[in-house]
Amino acid sequence: MNITIVSVGKLKEKYLKMGIDEYVKRLGGYAKIDLIEVADEKAPEQLSDAEMEIVKKKEGERILAKISTDTYVIALAINGKMKTSEQMAADLESLMTYGKSKIAFVIGGSLGLHEDVLKRADEQQSFGKMTLPHQLMKLVLVEQVYRSFRIMKGEPYHK
């Protein structure tokens, strides 16, 4: 299985990079993991609704350019479906069973994802109603993907 995580913005925090790298290394025995970062759109602190839409659209275009047409897309969105770790594992296993060998998780920038990205997504998943920094979300996501594979294989880790 090929799993791609497309996220907006460059990861700068060393402690997050170390955590992500550790889980990517652990995942190596289960799946091929690609981390793709697209540039975030520079914007002032105070934006009108129209300006926010423009920023999200530009970031969305960059995201969509990185996703092939044969990829199953899971957009991380606050209004998406919340799952337990077991449900996430079962869903990933089901995708593999039905021949979906390319899966992309998409993490938006600080303003979220543009409607075009949400429309392209095959599903939307939420990790809760709290707002998290998108770079921290990447670490949480990689850990949950690793946990999913451990659950699928019946290996100890998940408690």
UniProtKB/Swiss-Prot annotation:
- Any one GO cellular component localisation term in the record: cytoplasm
The primary gene name is rlmH
Q: In UniProt terms, what function does this protein have? A: Specifically methylates the pseudouridine at position 1915 (m3Psi1915) in 23S rRNA.
Q: Indicate what this protein is called per its UniProt record.
A: Ribosomal RNA large subunit methyltransferase H
Q: Give the main EC class.
A: transferase
The residues forming the signal peptide are none
Q: Does the keyword ATP-binding apply?
A: no
Q: What is its EC number?
A: 2.1.1.177
UniProt keywords, alphabetically: Cytoplasm, Methyltransferase, rRNA processing, S-adenosyl-L-methionine, Transferase
Please list the GO terms describing molecular function.
rRNA (pseudouridine-N3-)-methyltransferase activity
User: Pfam families per the record?
Assistant: SPOUT_MTase (PF02590)
Subunit (UniProt): Homodimer.
Per the UniProt entry, what species is this protein from, by scientific name?
Answer: Lysinibacillus sphaericus (strain C3-41)
Q: Which reaction does it catalyse?
A: pseudouridine(1915) in 23S rRNA + S-adenosyl-L-methionine = N(3)-methylpseudouridine(1915) in 23S rRNA + S-adenosyl-L-homocysteine + H(+)
Q: What family is this?
A: Belongs to the RNA methyltransferase RlmH family.
| InterPro entries, A to Z | Alpha/beta_knot_MTases, RlmH-like, tRNA_m1G_MTases_N
Localisation per UniProt entry? Cytoplasm
Q: Where does S-adenosyl-L-methionine bind?
A: 76, 108, 127-132
The source's superkingdom equals: Bacteria
